[in-house]
Amino acid sequence: MLIFTTVNNPGIYHLFVYGSLRSGFKSPVYEYISRFFSFAGKAKVRGKMFDMGSYPAGMPTNDSHFIVGELYVANNPLEFSWAIGQLDDYEGVSVEPDEVQLYRREITEVYIDNKVVHAWIYWYNGDVSGRPLIASGDLIEYLNEKK
């Protein structure tokens, strides 16, 4: 799996989301995303997803596990830095010096329609020991099964 750990990489205007930022949640943050990004399609990335209670934790892997989510592309590349900065605040990437980042934003390979594109993703930055694995890799499917 190809991961770049730089925070800003010119030319990457795609965003992959797998949790509460997905369209199925209809959250205020999704409404924000839909203003600055256009839906490109359902997609997947190599990784494992864990149930942290009130939110999911995606962790990158090199094995055959996949996380199901959605790929978005910025409507206006000139607004991308500002828009992604707002999402960084929401995801706990932008923290004070004495705080720990809840998530980290990186570039990863996204599989969509038999193609591979590079996109930003928010990976969980904490410990998932003892947390349930979401085996399907699809948070919406997992939550529907729990009902």
Q: Model-found features: residue ranges?
A:
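Glycine-aromatic micro-motifs
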Residues: 2-147
